[in-house]
Amino acid sequence: MIGEKKKRIGLIFGGYSNEHEVSISSAKTVFQAFNSEINKKRFKVKSFYIDKYGDWLDNDLSEKILNDEIKSNNIKKQEIVNQQKINFLDGIEFQNIDVWFPLLHGLNGEDGSIHGLLQYTRKPIVGCGILGSAIGMDKIMMKTIFSNLKIPQVNYLAFQNEDLDDREVKKKVINEILKKLNFPFFVKPSNSGSSLGISKVINESEILQSLEKAQKIDSRILVEEGLEVREIECGIIGNSELLTSEIGEIKYESDWYDYDSKYYSNNKIIIPAEIDSKITKEIKKIAIQSCRALNIFGFARVDFFLEKSSNKILLNEINTIPGFTTNSMFPMLWKASGLNIEQLVAKLVDISLDL
């Protein structure tokens, strides 16, 4: 509308996380979408880059990263001093924000910590709240809730660091895994994303190394049985009413859908997925049911397995801040559903304002 004041968007990216670089890539896509011809009439973006040490940097340096004028790993300490780090608690840099758009993937962001901090500003936040974010980040807690709801999943076991304290205890854990799960299986940190820290285990000799690898990232470890499956994904947006996107399938060239496959491989994306209409309907139903159960709203991506031998639907996990990179499934799903990236980011802001 003529004369309507532009909404000031606080775009937060980077972060003290193993998924730092993915966050930057996502933020670049969203930044460009907000600065498109159609959106720059409605929105003005102020960027906040959080470096790998957790320091907040001001808009000028943040925009240079988003515009590829400088690489995040080339920022010198002197530049940070000259630009002056931002103290969030001072509030000076944050007073003129109307809506927050956090794009921090992984720990110290997607786990609800950034949402809790931003609530102190009393401004709307794109995405879900603290509870849904925290549960969505913790695979073990998430799967426990899904189990209580009787939603089908792959067989799994969960362990704590104290379960792996010494050699004898580790032997008991390995024996339990061998007794209850069939090869292959996947060992995962409970709190991690983008397949970081995950190992595919095909024989007994690999178990201990995979457990120790996961321990380096998190103190809680998930072990899931591997099946012959198709990777199916569904996008969710909304608040009181959750909308589902088209269903998509990812076909990858590697042995499994690891970090490199997600971000550096030429995967085949099929949207809509070539599956039966009844299965599509059931996947969408479970996607909404699972988000409601975890108090997830705003936007999310719900990941499923479809067992090849039986077409059985298995819920995998929910990502509360899915990737927005050029290779990311979430924006592709919504583009196929009638919302291009420019429309999508605007829609997500509108959803946050409706809360």
From Swiss-Prot:
Where would I find the ATP-grasp domain in this sequence? 143-350
Q: Which InterPro entries match?
A: ATP-grasp, ATP_grasp_subdomain_1, D-Ala_lig_Van_CS, D_ala_D_ala, Dala_Dala_lig_C, Dala_Dala_lig_N, PreATP-grasp_dom_sf
Where primarily located? Answer: cytoplasm
Q: Which cofactor does it need?
A: Mg(2+); Mn(2+)
Entry keyword set: ATP-binding, Cell shape, Cell wall biogenesis/degradation, Cytoplasm, Ligase, Magnesium, Manganese, Metal-binding, Nucleotide-binding, Peptidoglycan synthesis
The record's remark on the cofactor is: Binds 2 magnesium or manganese ions per subunit.
Which residues hold Mg(2+) 2? E317, N319
Tell me the residue numbers annotated for binding ATP. 178-233
User: Biological process (GO) annotations?
Assistant: cell wall organization; peptidoglycan biosynthetic process; regulation of cell shape
Give the residues the record marks as binding Mg(2+) 1: D303, E317
EC annotation from Swiss-Prot or TrEMBL: 6.3.2.4
A Pfam family of this chain: Dala_Dala_lig_C
Q: What class of enzyme is it?
A: ligase
Question: Which PANTHER family is this protein grouped with?
Answer: D-ALANINE--D-ALANINE LIGASE, D-ALANINE--D-ALANINE LIGASE A
HAMAP family attached to this UniProt entry: Dala_Dala_lig
Q: Which family does it belong to?
A: Belongs to the D-alanine--D-alanine ligase family.
Q: What's the name of the protein?
A: D-alanine--D-alanine ligase
